[in-house]
Regions:
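Non-catalytic, well-ordered alpha-helical segments in soluble enzyme domains
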Residues: 89, 230-241
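Acidic, metal-coordinating catalytic cores used for nucleic-acid/nucleotide bond scission
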Residues: 223-226
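PAPS-dependent sulfotransferase catalytic core
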Residues: 251-265
């Protein structure tokens, strides 16, 4: 396939080869052929990514888009909710009545699962602006226009141990992958056999983006340790300074017990 080279594959052990578990556990190792990224190592990606690679690379980007990016299980769903409310005048009724993923699209998840779920993936293009996208892709597989249009990017990192444990329960309990135990998951993850690994390269490559003026770096631990201050900085970055009243309401809305059902990635 033009633009991408497949250098390895992991076959699914799922009972239903056409079910969701197979979508999640069928994996490939790929490298981009674009000279800009030729030095980057092979990355483990869902096999279904091949069918959406061209659309992803050619995806239309607007200057007022905002991309929230992080490795899976890094706190992106929490920050996604905060960002949507900041950018939509704290419309809590709208947040309650419309599913999170219809307000701020999980870009990579729908790209690889829409054939089975029947999701209208074209909705990603038609979302009302300003659009918010959550994405876990490694930097070399983002849409090409990101590097020319330069929309705002929020990048979040979480401690590797916590990510690895949380990722195990996601694979076991929600994706229903055929994993014997957490040790097998750790072996997969640390040998770069789970989605978007190798982990350290995923994180470090986003920190080395050259000449990118619109990126906000944050950590999950920093947010948990000082929610008011980090939230204010995020709001300032988005061009949405936050009042004390709105800050209190937002932090209450985003308490863990209230977000529990939404915290999927």
């Amino acid at each position: 396939m033009e633009g991408i080279e497949v250098v390895g594959e992991i076959k699914s052990k799922a009972v239903d080869p056409k079910g969701m578990a197979a979508v999640f556990s069928d994996r490939i190792f790929v490298k981009p052929t674009d000279p800009k990224w030729k030095e980057f190592p092979a990355v483990c990606m869902p096999k279904a990514f091949l069918g959406d690679f061209e659309r992803t690379k050619n995806f239309k980007i607007y200057e007022d888009d905002v991309w929230l990016i992080g490795f899976p299980r890094s706190g992106t769903t929490l920050v996604q909710e905060m960002m949507w409310l900041m950018m939509n005048d704290y419309n809590y009724e709208g947040a309650k009545s419309v599913d999170t993923y219809n307000r701020a699209q999980w870009f990579d998840f729908f790209n690889v699962t829409h054939p089975i779920q029947g999701v209208d993936v074209g909705y990603q293009d038609r979302m009302p602006r300003p659009r918010i996208y959550k994405c876990h892709y490694p930097v070399q597989f983002l849409p090409d226009q990101i590097w020319t249009v330069k929309p705002k990017i929020v990048h979040i990192v979480r401690d590797l141990k916590d990510v690895a444990i949380s990722y195990y329960y996601l694979r076991k309990n929600q994706w229903h992958e055929d994993i014997e135990n957490i040790e097998d998951h750790f072996e997969d993850m640390f040998s770069a056999k789970t989605w978007y690994t190798p982990y350290r390269e995923h994180i470090e490559n986003y920190k080395r983006i050259p000449d990118y003026p619109n990126i906000f770096y944050m950590t999950y631990e920093g947010l948990m340790a000082d929610k008011p201050n980090v939230t204010r900085k995020l709001a300032e970055f988005l061009g949405k300074p936050i009042s004390d009243e709105n800050l209190d309401q937002l932090l209450d809305h985003c308490k863990f017990e209230k977000m529990r059902g939404k915290l999927t990635s």
